[in-house]
């Protein structure tokens, strides 16, 4: 038993990199009672550079530095460790001296259109799924690295996913943590190793890939600049579940395995934790993906549209700012009449920016159903249609999951911003027939902390210890 488990647990810092905002949070303790403070939040987003879409890497690092210095001012006790999680697939390319060769591309950059066609010809989708368990998507790191090759970037240039790169800039060695490595489309589905066959068919340099490490690995001590701050004098750097969805799932305080999760936000990810990947043609054709999870498991889920739909309808129809208040709109939607039918939220046209209210009405027309007037006063009706359609889609996806895995489901946990949408949660419970529990909004921060605490007590990837700390932290966190 470690010393901190016999007395007060340690203070730790979680950095959560988001495509829209980045957060630095501090975990402190009052005896055995945790106190979590969001110390610094900064906006983030891709920046147009000529014909490309990039991330402002230095700006991101500056905001992380500000957050860490504020953490040092907020506590009188040492900070034991720092962990970083964030969005997947994007990365930094490095020269021989370890210096970035430029700001990293955003996954929405159109350069993967050409590389996607090249990969589809060289590496069939069925082969990629069988080898990696991941749905072939053009945003994946695999496609971006091939785009680099087509653009003449030297293949020997090493690369590091963004959360792990930030950890390296804080003093750690350059690594790829398993949950984030899975999103590259280059990790072997069955082993904790890069898949050489996929590197080969894509024409990528295997030696440019970073060292793989398991979830919760200690990758070094903070750099001298941070060590000058007394609170960081002996701080370790830990690779948590570096993919933010994996961290969010790690933050769920669940018992047993008869449960599903929905990571709900701009996108929705309905799925379940499994001990082994599902690599069948049926799973691939149903659109499920196998990603790594903390505790040596797999996140088996499907990408489904989410609150993106409502944001786009608001963008189309909102005239007065008051009509755009999300909380009031959800309440008005609950008072609206039940729609005559639902729309297919994953219809390809609804995945792109545009006049989504018009596109949803087109779907209603195709079903012979009444359309909704495309005016601001109809926003509650559109919101109700979206929520009803999402709830039905969740029921369909979870039904497919049960059929593919044989998993019995007794409860659903909702994490992310969508957990605050009580009406959508109610509709989801009604559609699935399952009780639903609301997780905390920043579940990725909870999961980040939980993995760090398990690592500090010598059980970095122990499922039971991660789950224990998730329960402790959820007990005092705000939904």
Which role fits each region the language model picked out?
Residues 59-72, 191-197, 393-400:
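Short, well-ordered amphipathic alpha-helical segments that serve as non-catalytic structural scaffolds
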Residues 8, 18-20, 78, 85-87, ...:
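Short, basic and Ser/Thr-rich N-terminal targeting/leader segments
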Residues 109:
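Carbohydrate-associated surface elements
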Residues 49, 69, 73-106, 132-139, ...:
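Short beta-strand-loop/turn "lid" adjacent to the catalytic site in phosphate-handling enzymes
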Residues 50-54, 125-135, 208:
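Short glycine/proline- and acidic residue-enriched helix-loop micro-motifs
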Residues 2-7, 13-14, 26, 113, ...:
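Active-site core segments that coordinate phosphate-bearing ligands/cofactors
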Residues 77-86, 157-158, 211, 404-416:
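Short glycine-rich phosphate-binding loop at a beta-alpha junction
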Residues 1-102, 130, 227-237, 432-434:
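N-terminal glycine/serine-rich phosphate-binding loop of ATP-dependent small-molecule kinases
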């Amino acid at each position: 038993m470690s010393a901190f488990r016999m007395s007060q647990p340690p203070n730790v810092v979680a950095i959560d990199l988001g495509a829209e905002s980045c957060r630095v949070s501090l975990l402190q303790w009052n005896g055995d009672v945790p106190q979590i403070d969001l110390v610094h939040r900064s906006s983030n987003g891709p920046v147009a550079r000529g014909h490309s879409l990039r991330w402002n890497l230095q700006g991101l690092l500056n905001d992380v530095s500000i957050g860490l210095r504020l953490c040092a001012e907020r506590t009188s006790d040492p900070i034991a460790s720092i962990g970083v999680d964030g969005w997947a697939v994007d990365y930094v390319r490095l020269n021989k001296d370890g210096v970035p060769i430029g700001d990293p591309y955003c996954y929405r950059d159109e350069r993967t259109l050409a590389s996607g066609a090249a990969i589809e010809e060289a590496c069939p989708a069925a082969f990629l799924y069988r080898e990696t368990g991941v749905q072939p998507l053009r945003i994946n790191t695999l496609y971006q690295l091939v785009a680099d090759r087509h653009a003449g970037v030297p293949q020997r240039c090493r690369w590091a996913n963004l959360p792990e790169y930030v950890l390296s800039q804080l003093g750690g060695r350059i690594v790829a943590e398993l949950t984030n490595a899975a999103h590259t489309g280059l990790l072997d589905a069955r082993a904790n190793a890069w898949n050489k066959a996929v590197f080969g068919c894509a024409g990528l340099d295997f030696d440019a890939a970073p060292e793989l490490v398991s979830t919760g690995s200690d990758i070094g001590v903070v750099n001298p600049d941070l060590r000058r701050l007394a609170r960081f004098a002996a701080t370790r750097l830990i690779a948590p579940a570096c993919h933010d969805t994996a961290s969010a799932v790690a933050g769920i305080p669940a018992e047993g395995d008869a449960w599903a999760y929905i990571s709900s936000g701009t996108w929705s990810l309905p799925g379940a934790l499994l001990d082994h990947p599902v690599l069948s043609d049926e799973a691939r054709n149903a659109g499920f993906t196998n990603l790594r999870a903390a505790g040596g498991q797999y996140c088996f889920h499907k990408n489904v549209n989410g609150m993106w739909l409502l944001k786009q309808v608001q963008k189309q129809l909102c005239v007065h700012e008051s009509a755009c208040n999300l909380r009031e709109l959800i309440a008005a939607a609950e008072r609206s009449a039940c729609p005559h039918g639902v729309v297919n939220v994953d219809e390809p046209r609804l995945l792109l920016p545009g006049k989504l209210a018009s596109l949803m009405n087109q779907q209603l027309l195709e079903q012979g159903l009444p359309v909704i007037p495309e005016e601001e006063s109809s926003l509650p009706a559109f919101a109700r249609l979206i929520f009803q359609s999402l709830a039905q889609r969740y029921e369909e996806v979870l039904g497919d999951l049960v059929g593919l895995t044989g998993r019995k489901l007794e409860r659903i946990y909702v994490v992310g911003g969508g957990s605050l949408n009580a009406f959508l949660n109610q509709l989801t419970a009604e559609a699935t027939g399952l009780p639903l529990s609301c997780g905390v909004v920043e579940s990725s921060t909870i999961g980040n902390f939980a993995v760090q605490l398990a690592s500090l007590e010598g059980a970095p990837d122990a499922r039971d210890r991660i789950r224990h700390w998730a329960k402790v932290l959820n007990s005092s966190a705000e939904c």
